[in-house]
From Swiss-Prot:
Organism expressing this protein natively: Escherichia coli O17:K52:H18 (strain UMN026 / ExPEC)
Binding-site list for Mg(2+): 61, 125
Function: Involved in the degradation of chitin. ChbG is essential for growth on the acetylated chitooligosaccharides chitobiose and chitotriose but is dispensable for growth on cellobiose and chitosan dimer, the deacetylated form of chitobiose. Deacetylation of chitobiose-6-P and chitotriose-6-P is necessary for both the activation of the chb promoter by the regulatory protein ChbR and the hydrolysis of phosphorylated beta-glucosides by the phospho-beta-glucosidase ChbF.
Gene name for this UniProt entry: chbG
Pathway noted in the entry: Glycan degradation; chitin degradation
Name the UniProt record assigns to this protein: Chitooligosaccharide deacetylase
Cofactor(s), by name: Mg(2+)
GO cellular component: a single term: cytoplasm
Length: 249
């Protein structure tokens, strides 16, 4: 049985090094999809690079934890910027959901302005769309706009009927122990669960000053090395997987 594999590189637009890494992993590796941060410091650079890579499917990486929002978000920003304090607000059930709804719509429109088309799908920076308070907002928006959504089905079960997503999602290809065997173990685990479609999240990048400031730095370069391995591409095909994007879901 043929299975669909979407290898999605997060953080398109974060930095030039991140952008170049994603393009390299698409051209010479197994990355088929990416998600862009429309408020990223290198988003214009990402748009420019994407014009020469029509095979790369591009979705939107909804941002609520970094940089400046596109709308006024007094309930979520501090000194005008977003940050990881969103976790504390979520724990206190004090998230400004109306502000988040408006920001989602604004980032979506900004994506269309930048890339000239709808995103293939939605996900989010630091997985904030999986917060139980935020997920219904994002799921409803994706369903209404007719675009797919990254959804970890181990965390949510109540999905809109017309929402497109994969049967499986994995964030396990991450950390200090990145290897081909780890990637293939993710696929094997998915196969054992009987999933016919799977998204694997990744973050391939070349190191630059912005990436050096990230808590997740050098493994991004290791990811790039693994994702451009010819032997990995062969092993994926051997397991009955077809590389694709959320347009195939």
């Amino acid at each position: 049985m043929e299975r669909l594999l979407i290898v999605n590189a997060d953080d398109f637009g974060l930095s030039k090094g991140q952008n170049y890494g994603i393009i390299e992993a698409c051209r010479n590796g197994i990355v088929t999809s990416t998600t862009a941060l429309v408020n990223g410091q290198a988003i214009d650079h990402a748009v420019q690079l994407s014009r020469d890579e029509p095979s790369l499917a591009i979705g939107m990486h909804f941002v609520l934890t970094m940089g400046k929002p596109l709308t006024a978000m007094p309930g979520l920003t501090r000194d005008g910027v977003l940050g990881k304090w969103i976790w504390q607000l979520a724990e206190e059930d004090a998230l400004p959901l109306e502000e988040i709804t408006q920001e989602l719509a604004s980032q979506y429109l900004r994506f269309i302005e930048l890339f000239g088309r709808k995103p293939t799908h939605l996900d989010s920076h630091h997985h904030v769309h999986m917060f139980p308070q935020i997920f219904p907002i994002v799921a409803r928006f994706a369903a209404e706009e007719g675009i797919a959504l990254r959804a970890d089905r181990q965390m949510v079960f109540d999905l809109p009927v017309n929402l497109r997503t994969t049967q499986g999602f994995s964030s396990a290809f991450y950390g200090e122990e990145i290897s081909e065997s780890l990637f293939l173990q993710v696929l094997d685990d998915s196969s054992h669960r009987g999933e016919r479609s799977l998204e694997v999240m990744c973050h391939p990048a070349f190191i630059d000053n912005t990436i050096r400031q990230s808590a997740y730095c050098l493994p991004r370069l290791t990811e790039l090395d693994v994702l451009t391995s010819a032997s990995l591409k062969y092993a994926i095909a051997e397991r009955g997987y077809r590389l694709g994007s959320y347009l195939d879901v």
